[in-house]
Amino acid sequence: MPASGMLFANDHDAGRTFIFDLRDPLHPKIVTSFTEMAGYLHPHSYLRLPNDHVLATFQHEHYGASEEPMGSTGGPVEIDDQGKVIRSASNADPAFAGALLTPYSLVVLPELDRVVSTNSSMHLDYIFAGVTYQVWRLYDFKLLKTAYFDVGENRYAQISPEETRLGPDGSIFVQTLGCGLERITGVNTDEPRSRLVYTFPGNWCGVPTIGGHYLVQSAGAMHGLIVLDITNAAKPVEVS
């Protein structure tokens, strides 16, 4: 629970986010709700920043009633606990005009002044179209880099990059819907890199958890969980 007692809860399909005041847990109340923020729609992931504001990934730009309602790009939006927009940025990148750029998850690295976000769609028509990640400067939301994920031997494990997790060594692990585990390094350099370091069985993997030097991943193909030892982050080892 955030120290402020304010909880953001998202109904993604409806595109509406609710902010709950839980400072009195037995008498919760809704402070406000929102759909569009700073010209963006359909938020997906939320993280607390060091200043206690919330940074959210919005999947689509809102074009307005006279045009197509949702754009093919979105962006990060910083929001306070009252639902006020603090700042925002577009993740559009002219060098990747043909790529799907709908922000999905993100990880914040305050000590490096960086944010890393993934691009993956929640819409079934485009659910297997995402293959990129983006690196931002935290203090002003400047987009520094858009890059493709590493492609493995099976040619699909990099598809639909979803959840970002900060590893114990400071690198970033990304689970994909294609059941790959990508590792991003060098985000504070001009040339960040991703490497496919593990491939789980099947596909439709989601929502990994890191505890200590272990990464736990659900694997639908085996109806169970796989635990990796990521002490050597470049070469995870299955231990359970």
Which residue ranges define each predicted feature?
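Asp-box/WD-like beta-propeller blade repeats and closely related beta-sheet repeat scaffolds
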Residues: L22-P110
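Beta-propeller domains
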Residues: M1, A9-I30
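Conserved beta-propeller blade signature
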Residues: M6-A9, V54-L55, R114-V116, S171-V174, ...
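Short loop/turn segments immediately following beta-strands, especially the blade-tip
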Residues: I19-P28, E78-I86, V135-L144, R183-P192, ...
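Loop/turn-rich, solvent-exposed surfaces of beta-rich toroidal or solenoidal domains
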Residues: N203-S240
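Beta-rich, blade/repeat-based domains predominating
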Residues: M1-A3, M37-P50, A95-R114, V151-S171, ...
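Beta-propeller fold detector
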Residues: K29-E36, I86-D93, L143-D150, R193-F200, ...
